[in-house]
């Protein structure tokens, strides 16, 4: 089995329980995180085109199709966010709600442009997802990481995720190579409870 590139893609599941907005955030390194707007279709299409074809193997949606991205914008999905550096799309994260017996969970998809990897943008977007989950009353976040993506694995574990399982040969790339899939989880309701206990009375 070949080794997948670090920082390519992570998938997580979460479930929003209450409504909420996704405010713009800016870091000291001038990375802006915000929800998608109509003007982002072209830039986001170019962003996904910049991701190596081999990396896109792990995507669940046809991100090479501008109509797919236009569809995201058309429904005003505030759970699809981008990271901007000097007005260039550096990263993308999506938080998607599950259905049926998984309606209490959801899915997070994270992609960082090759030239911006290793700069902490992935961590910033992952942290944003956890914060949004707390705001939405999510009970549990589950992250899927392809085995061998050590930097991604380390990033999520530092954010409080723990490995729950390993699915053997669960992912196959365009070359037919199979990879194990690691399942990590984070009980964000417990985090919210601890923050509530630690917060001083007004």
Give residue ranges: language-model regions.
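A short beta-loop-alpha structural element at the N-terminal edge
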Residues: 31-44, 187
